[in-house]
A protein has these predicted regions:
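Acidic/His-rich, metal-assisted hydrolase cores and their charged scaffolds
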Residues: 1-168
Length: 168
């Protein structure tokens, strides 16, 4: 999913669809997603579809662009939350039950100017599900955090095959 999201963000930036913040930074803050992105970069012909390969033929990397930052260390991850500029943070969620996403939620859920976009399934009983179902407050690291950010869900990027995909 991370690579699909990067593909779409590259297009959004290339088409100047974000007015006033065209050069916004994008952080991939998941060590596994960073490794997967590296695999995509090293195996272009096996990983990209026809549309992405057309970009490659034009000398355009379909999942890279100015402002893309790959966060590896925990120090790099923590620093993201202290930058004041508008930004996109792509962080593996684990349904918001563990990992770096919890720190990003702690620093951004209370901010009405923030948007948290879920692109994966959130199981019943998880923090992610509570947030998408409209929780007004959640607990992170033992602290109550008011949910004032805009919460959105995009279901078109499942990381799992559907029934037909499994049969193939």
């Amino acid at each position: 999913r991370t690579q699909e999201i990067l593909y779409f963000i590259r297009k959004i930036k290339a088409d100047n669809l974000v007015t006033g913040h065209g050069n916004f930074p994008v952080y991939v803050d998941s060590p596994m997603a960073v490794r997967a992105t590296s695999i995509f970069q090293d195996n272009i012909s096996q990983c990209f579809d026809d549309a992405a390969m057309e970009l490659v033929k034009q000398g355009i990397n379909p999942i890279s662009f100015p402002g893309l930052n790959l966060s590896i260390t925990s120090e790099e991850s923590k620093a993201i939350n202290f930058e004041e500029t508008p930004k996109v943070i792509i962080s593996a969620s684990g349904m918001c039950e563990a990992g770096r996403i919890r720190h990003h939620l702690k620093h951004n859920l209370w901010r009405p100017e923030s948007t948290v976009l879920f692109v994966g399934y959130q199981a019943v009983g998880t923090l992610g599900r509570a947030i998408i179902e409209g929780a007004k407050e959640v607990r992170l690291f033992g602290e109550p955090i008011e949910v004032r950010a805009k919460i959105r869900q995009f279901n078109g990027l499942s990381g799992h095959a559907d029934k037909n995909g499994l049969v193939e």
